[in-house]
Amino acid sequence: MKHFSRLLALLLAVALLPLTFMAAASAEEPVTITIWGSDRENMPFRNGLWTIDVLQEKLGIKIEIISAPTENLAEKYGLLIASGDLPTIVQYKAKDLLLYKDAWTPLNDLINETDTPNLWKVYSDPEIRRKVSDADGIMRFIGQRTAITAGKLYFWRQDWLDKLNLATPKTTEDLYNVFKAIKECDPNGNGVADEIPFAVRKNGSNNRGNVIPFINAWGIAETFFAEDGQVKFGATDPRMKEALEWMNRCYAEGLIDQEYLTRDKTSWYSAWTNNQVFMSYDWSAYIDNVGNLFKDVETDINIVGAVPPEGPTGISETRDQLQPITVDEDWNAGIFVGATEEQKKAALKLLDYVYSEEGMILMNFGVEGQHFNIVDGEYKYSDLIMNNPDGLSPQDALRSFGIQSMLTLLQDARYERAFVSDEVNRIRDIYEQEGHIGPAFPTLAFTNDEQSVINEKYTEIETYMNEMVDKFIMGVEPLDKFDEYVAQVEKMGLADVLAVYQAAYDRYMK
C-alpha cells in the first residue's frame, strides 16, 4: 500500500509539472495596457506603428491602441465614459478629462523622484502641476511638454504680391484690399476669377478653427479670455461684432473660402496646386508642405510666412498657440482609476519613459542612422524623412513611423527646427520675439457645483454660439441681429457661467 501511495504521489507530481511550467510562463508574460486616442488624418495612432513596437520591446509591456477617428470624437469620448469600461490610458483634451475627474487615478503621490524621475523633473514645478490638476489640487493627467510657442502661422504667396506690385499688407483693411486685388486681377493668369484669397482646411471641433483667428486682431478670443483680471466671453463682446463685420464682408465678396467649414486637407491641397490660393493659416509645418506641392511643377512660386494683420487698435496677434504644457489638444493622458495596479505601474513606466532623454529622442527623431543623423552636433533627419521615397512630406513621413505621434509627450526644440525650412524658423522667431502671440486663457479646474452650472448652461450656449457665428460670417443671419443674439446668450445664463469661470480663474491665478 505504501509503495502504491509513493507511486501515486510521483505520478501526480509528474502530471503537475506542465501546470507549474505554465504558471511560471504566465507570470513572465508582459502586462497589457490599452490606450484610447484620436487617430487623425495627419497623425495616425494605431497598432502596428513602428514606435509602438519599439516601446513594447524596450519596456517589456504589451500596448494595444484603441484608435478613435476624429470625426465626432467628442461623442465617441462621451460614449466611452458612459460605458464605464475604460482602457488603461485615455488621451483627450484636459477640460474633458477634468469633466470626469474621478475616472482618473490621482497622480500626486505616484509622480515622485524615485519611481518616475523623468516625470518628476517636470511636474514637481507647482506652476506646471496646477495645469494638470483639478480644483482640489489633485493631479489627474499627464500633458505634453512643448518646446516652442509659435505653432500656427499665417502664410501666403509672395510671388503673387510681387506680380501685382502689391505692398505687404499690415492692417486688416490692407489685407482686405489685397484680397480684392487677388480676386480681381487674375494672378494665376487663367482668365477666370477662380482665385481664393484666403483658404483653409477645416480644423477644430467646430471646423472654423483656422478662420476664426482673424478676430484676435480686435483683441479678443472666440470664447473665454481675461482682460485686466476679468473673465470675458469673446463671442458676445462688442468687438466680436466688428470682427464679424470684417469677416462677413470678406466672405460675401468671395475673399474667404466659401467652403471653409467642409474643406478637408486633400481638397485644400488641390486648391493650392490648382493655383487658386493666396493665403492660409495652419500649423507651421504646412508652409513647407504647401511649398513642396509645387517643387516639381512651378519654379517661381514663393510661399512665405506672414505676421497677423493689425486690427483697429494696432493689435497683431494670434491666441491659439502652444503653451509650456499643451492641454487643449487630444494627447493629455489620464490613467483609468479602475485599472489593475500592474497596469497602472506599466502605464506610468511608459509615460515616464517618453519623458526621458532616450524616450524623447525616440519619439521626436527615431533611431540614429535610420531616421536621423548627428552632423556637427546637430540633429538632421535622414533622406528617409526629408526626401521620403513614398513622396510623403517630412512631417507625414515621421508620423508614418509613429514619430511625433500621440505619445510624443516631451517635445524637443531640435525637432521643431530640424525638419522645417529656414523660412519657417524665420517667421516662428518673429512671432515669438516680436509680440505676435497673444495671451492664452488657461484650462481651468472646476468644483462639482461649478461643473454642474457649466453642464446645465454653457453646453447650450456653446451650441447656439457655434451656429450663430458661422451664420454671421456667411451672411445667413445679418449682423443687425447681433444684439438679439447677445440677448439670447445672456438669457441662457451667461452671467452664471462667467461667475463660475471667474471663481475658477481667480483660484488659478493665486
Label every model-predicted segment.
Residues 29-33, 59-63, 84-88, 102-105, ...:
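Loop/turn elements at helix/coil->beta-strand transitions in domains of secreted/extracellular proteins
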Residues 9-20:
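Bacterial N-terminal signal peptides
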Residues 39-45, 50, 55, 150, ...:
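Extracytoplasmic/periplasmic substrate-binding proteins
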Residues 38, 349-467, 476:
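Conserved small-residue motifs centered on glycine
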Residues 249-251, 268-292, 299-302, 307-400:
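Glycine-rich, aromatic-lined ligand/substrate-binding cores of catalytic
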Residues 1-11:
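Bacterial N-terminal signal peptides that target proteins for export
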Residues 22-175, 207-213, 222-226, 231-235, ...:
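Conserved N-terminal structural module of periplasmic/extracytoplasmic solute-binding proteins
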Residues 134-207, 225-271, 276, 333-346, ...:
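Helix-loop-helix "hinge/cap" segment bordering the ligand-binding cleft or interdomain interface
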